[in-house]
Amino acid sequence: MAEAEGESLESWLNKATNPSNRQEDWEYIIGFCDQINKELEGPQIAVRLLAHKIQSPQEWEALQALTVLEACMKNCGRRFHNEVGKFRFLNELIKVVSPKYLGDRVSEKVKTKVIELLYSWTMALPEEAKIKDAYHMLKRQGIVQSDPPIPVDRTLIPSPPPRPKNPVFDDEEKSKLLAKLLKSKNPDDLQEANKLIKSMVKEDEARIQKVTKRLHTLEEVNNNVRLLSEMLLHYSQEDSSDGDRELMKELFDQCENKRRTLFKLASETEDNDNSLGDILQASDNLSRVINSYKTIIEGQVINGEVATLTLPDSEGNSQCSNQGTLIDLAELDTTNSLSSVLAPAPTPPSSGIPILPPPPQASGPPRSRSSSQAEATLGPSSTSNALSWLDEELLCLGLADPAPNVPPKESAGNSQWHLLQREQSDLDFFSPRPGTAACGASDAPLLQPSAPSSSSSQAPLPPPFPAPVVPASVPAPSAGSSLFSTGVAPALAPKVEPAVPGHHGLALGNSALHHLDALDQLLEEAKVTSGLVKPTTSPLIPTTTPARPLLPFSTGPGSPLFQPLSFQSQGSPPKGPELSLASIHVPLESIKPSSALPVTAYDKNGFRILFHFAKECPPGRPDVLVVVVSMLNTAPLPVKSIVLQAAVPKSMKVKLQPPSGTELSPFSPIQPPAAITQVMLLANPLKEKVRLRYKLTFALGEQLSTEVGEVDQFPPVEQWGNL
């Protein structure tokens, strides 16, 4: 066997499928399989190489490639199965047997073996639904007349299905206690065991009832969204009847009522529960159809842009999120689904919804959008980038702002940092908006340097960090104290992010300090007139001295003015260690990699995100973990407008430094995959278990995608700084 050192996947495959081989060389075939398992992007690269070899005009080379593919399916595990089970690869196999493509030029031996492999996979891998779809499509078109006989050696042995876990009966402590009681000969212990069994059964029944209620709610939401979406698609102001409008209004009201229900479900669902993704998806679909109704029926403009409408599928997922479609579908119209990357002539998408004209520009400063928002109007399959209601709630709970792009430009109006900050305009708490309590949107912050109001080139202050959510049990303050509904006090804290172009050198000046003093006086008066506190005491904003001089803007967050609003009925937790990461900046070149294995945070459609952990903590902060986020693209399409956001529990803090870029070029077999790096800082002073949720938005080709996920595989906290 040749020297394995330095061998690549391509060299292994070239030797395994060499047309000069007299017989199948299993040394190189197994070496190819082992190399797939070793490499991080092994399955993604391997299927592309195999697709090219399988379509070889030389029969012997193609047959050897199919043998290699069969061996990989048996030896390379689920990661390889997932890549084979995508339409991108299945379309390449269909081209081999379809007369519309290569079927007339390929030998019968090759076509027969392809059909045998597809059929064996449908039997052994029922979870890969796309393989079954591809095989049934070939049968419908008459390419496959009958199911071929499968030899025993070609049959994949499916792994046994995992035993369904019952969180109640799988409780290790209760199981040990129950076993101990049952082994005892004491009648009291047996009676106690009986009580324990009954309590476990009741707990399981309550869990099942909760799951049933959740499924019923999700089904009801998806049905309402689907019906309202279909009616909006066919709505015409001239032709639609009053009955249709009444039905749409009723569906709209039901969707509005279900938004709170979904948020409550999301807050009650465990972080590791797989159904959390379904709840978030249903919430996104709900917000999308509500925005579409307001745009089409009521003529409103949602977040400064016109909402586009997409129909969710039967499972509640939006059609625009499909990974691809099969080719050769008997001339079926596929305009509503994404054309395959490998299809020779993709059909341009069409839509039944008239594209509404953009809203007229206001006389004030124009509302900025990120590059991903600007691409939201590319076609009907693009999802609306308007923040959903659940997104707003999550952002209020501490979702990190997207980091600025590098290199930033000097112009604040054109800088990508400014665009990304204004994309989260709902985080501007200074000016409340009707209908929102914790989150409000405003086009101009309250505090600005004195300047003529007509100037449109004045750069606004950076958006403040999120304010604490005020519980619904607290009575709403009067109109005179509306400042309290949006958490003014924490919003006044200065942001000292070092990488904010256009704002870094902005001084408030004397005028802004007078604004600050006037606002302080207004807060004191509002507390008394609103009836929330007595004139003699101030539980909302504690003060240390009766008469406080004018605060310089450099005053830290510990000063009374910057204390967050709290209520005695809520029970404020004791102040923990310092969480601020504003003054910490870790250059990428100074980071030393650790021996800890990287964690895959996202891996779909050739776009992959990995978390690499640094060996050391920042100086003076042993509670901060440095993570290098690597974004890789192995897809044949470019990935653009990449924005990563992160959120952690309230006892922690997360900060994303500017990424090295926002675009990834398409994959090339002769060059290494394109990559983006971004440094993430995670503060955990209480040394709790880390659970990080992320929101990822990007455009793969022309398709906009929004993904939400969670990562909890972080190194043990006690090992931070010495990984």
Swiss-Prot record:
The modification Phosphoserine is found at residues 159, 275. Residues 339-384, 428-464 are annotated as: Disordered. Phosphorylated by CK2 and dephosphorylated by PP2A. Phosphorylation of GGA3 allows the internal DXXLL motif to bind the VHS domain and to inhibit the recognition of cargo signals. Ubiquitinated. GO terms for molecular function: phosphatidylinositol binding; protein transporter activity; protein-containing complex binding; small GTPase binding; ubiquitin binding. Residues 594-715 form the GAE domain. Changing residue 293 to H: Loss of UBC-binding and ubiquitination. Residues 345-363 have a biased composition (Pro residues). Coiled coil: none annotated. Changing residue 194 to A: Loss of interaction with ARF1 and Golgi localization. This is ADP-ribosylation factor-binding protein GGA3. It comes from Homo sapiens. The gene is GGA3.
